């Protein structure tokens, strides 16, 4: 059985993320979305909120589950008996960074990284950009799953 991990902070999950998850789920028997904790970052959404939003947005994917983790991604991957990481790429800038990480993960732990090119319609979408635009009153409904947009708007209203 093949399995892969899609790691990230997902604060919040975007339609671009969901597209990558769907495509990974079509290639692997099992996919774990790893919502990672970075103690140096203060997110807009709590860990539990981020996990719930991903689970809601991906309920149509029976071979996908959501877990939290901290520390090295390769340790998270190997603890589950997997040997693959899936990362989405929006641009050549993403590729430069992710290639370096992929090579390190292979060197340190023998874990392979599979890159999935972002759909052109999502190549500009990021969680931070969606939050920034929403904070300034812009419409981000085309960037986020509906339930996530509702939560973001509620969070901004206080």
Swiss-Prot record:
**GO annotation, cellular component aspect:** cytoplasm
Q: Say if the entry is tagged with keyword Nucleotidyltransferase.
A: yes
Listed Gene3D superfamilies: HUPs
Residues reported to bind ATP: 9-10, 17, 88-90, 98, 122-128
User: InterPro entries, from UniProt?
Assistant: Cyt_trans-like (IPR004821), PPAT (IPR001980), Rossmann-like_a/b/a_fold (IPR014729)
Task: Name the needed cofactors.
Answer: Mg(2+)
Q: Which SUPFAM superfamilies match?
A: Nucleotidylyl transferase (SSF52374)
What are the UniProt keywords, alphabetically?
Answer: ATP-binding, Coenzyme A biosynthesis, Cytoplasm, Magnesium, Nucleotide-binding, Nucleotidyltransferase, Transferase
What residues does the record give for site: Transition state stabilizer?
17
Which HAMAP family does the record cross-reference, listed alphabetically? Answer: PPAT_bact (MF_00151)
Q: What does this protein do?
A: Reversibly transfers an adenylyl group from ATP to 4'-phosphopantetheine, yielding dephospho-CoA (dPCoA) and pyrophosphate.
Q: What family is this?
A: Belongs to the bacterial CoaD family.
Record protein name field: Phosphopantetheine adenylyltransferase
Its taxonomic path starts at:
Bacteria, Bacillati, Actinomycetota, Actinomycetes, Mycobacteriales
């Amino acid at each position: 059985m093949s399995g892969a991990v899609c790691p990230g902070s997902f604060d919040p999950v975007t339609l671009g993320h969901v597209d990558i998850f769907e495509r990974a789920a079509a290639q692997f028997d099992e996919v774990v979305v790893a919502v990672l904790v970075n103690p140096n970052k203060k997110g807009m959404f709590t860990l539990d909120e981020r996990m719930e939003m991903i689970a809601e947005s991906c309920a149509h994917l029976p071979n996908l589950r959501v877990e939290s983790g901290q520390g090295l991604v390769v340790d998270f991957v190997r603890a589950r008996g997997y040997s693959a990481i899936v990362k989405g790429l929006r641009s050549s800038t993403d590729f430069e960074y992710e290639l370096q990480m992929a090579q390190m993960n292979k060197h340190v732990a023998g874990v392979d990284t599979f890159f999935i090119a972002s759909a052109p319609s999502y190549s500009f979408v990021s969680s931070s950009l969606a939050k920034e635009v929403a904070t300034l009153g812009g419409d981000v409904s085309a960037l986020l799953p509906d339930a996530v947009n509702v939560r973001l708007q509620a969070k901004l209203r206080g």
